[in-house]
Amino acid sequence: MKFGPETIIHGDCIEQMNALPEKSVDLIFADPPYNLQLGGDLLRPDNSKVDAVDDHWDQFESFAAYDKFTREWLKAARRVLKDDGAIWVIGSYHNIFRVGVAVQDLGFWILNDIVWRKSNPMPNFKGTRFANAHETLIWASKSQNAKRYTFNYDALKMANDEVQMRSDWTIPLCTGEERIKGADGQKAHPTQKPEALLYRVILSTTKPGDVILDPFFGVGTTGAAAKRLGRKFIGIEREAEYLEHAKARIAKVVPIAPEDLDVMGSKRAEPRVPFGTIVEAGLLSPGDTLYCSKGTHVAKVRPDGSITVGDLSGSIHKIGALVQSAPACNGWTYWHFKTDAGLAPIDVLRAQVRAGMN
């Protein structure tokens, strides 16, 4: 079954997922009910009521009922997920640990838990607990053996000023103009997620054209971010009022032009080029000299692609590590060769070989 760029479905998430083709979606983002178990109104110090989550869809008669619901929707989600796909589930301390058990019991393989640190959290008005300033996201592949899930590591590193992206993300709550309001001026959905959060999830774990399923679509944050980033989406929501807000919101989204969607490619996906190939191609010759960037270590190239420094011999990586007394070394960036413009890393030569493979 081929999906159009936007598919919005009104109905029960379990029933509607069971009606979708098996193994048809690349990514699932789920923001299920939190089962907050509120015993009454939450009040501020001035006795005004906190606009908390007290909607009927968040109410379950027991933990057992919530667990049953969780396993049913996760089973339906797993059926429609491609073997190389992945799932994200977000929750608070009220539900995420119960959801995590179900995720593992049903055969998913947890890759990371992400802490969404809210830079502007709601305070604990009673002063009886720590201010709840984060939520947890579980990112999991379909199974332990699934190794080809999408992870745009280098794109995330570039987005983070060339520093490896960590598992704690500081993103503010959804406020201001981004917050969807009803006709009465009140927020249309109590747990609307910031689009920046979904932008990062989608950018990191999908490719343009992928199909993203959100079984708890709400007011369409996943759909808005997916449309903006050139991904297809399926949104399922049982509350008709939320869907009307979602449709109006998504209609206003202007997609990024397809030619502007390219991100940093993963070096792990590039063809492997042994250093010996550089010698075979004549880009370096046996007897040529390699230098570290500081000029403190000098190596000689041998015909088989190994190098020598004094009595030491081995690969560019092994010798680079030994001369630095380091546990490991990336020889491609450590060793340099002479050019008319000065020293250049031998990784430049590897790039030349790879360019010829395309």
From Swiss-Prot:
Q: Where is this region: Non-specific DNA-binding?
A: 272-358
Organism superkingdom: Bacteria
Q: How is it modified after translation?
A: Rapidly degraded by Lon protease prior to cell division.
Sequence segments annotated as region (Linker):
261-270
* Induction info: Transcribed from 80 minutes in synchronized cells.
DNA-binding annotation, residue ranges on this chain = 31-34, 39-45, 93-94, 109-110, 122-132, 153-157, 187-193, 315-317, 330-332
Q: What is its EC number?
A: 2.1.1.72
- Keywords, A to Z? DNA replication, DNA-binding, Methyltransferase, S-adenosyl-L-methionine, Transferase
Provide the catalytic activity annotation.
a 2'-deoxyadenosine in DNA + S-adenosyl-L-methionine = an N(6)-methyl-2'-deoxyadenosine in DNA + S-adenosyl-L-homocysteine + H(+)
Q: RAMA domain: from which residue to which, for each copy?
A: 259-355
Which EC class is the enzyme in? transferase
Function recorded in the entry: Opens a bubble in the DNA at the recognition site, allowing precise recognition of the sequence and ensuring enzyme specificity. Functions only in the predivisional cell. Responsible for 5'-GANTC-3' methylation in the cell; methylation of hemimethylated sites generated after replication fork passage occurs late in the predivisional cell, near completion of chromosome replication but prior to cell division.
Protein name per its UniProtKB record:
DNA methyltransferase CcrM
Q: Coding gene? A: ccrMIM
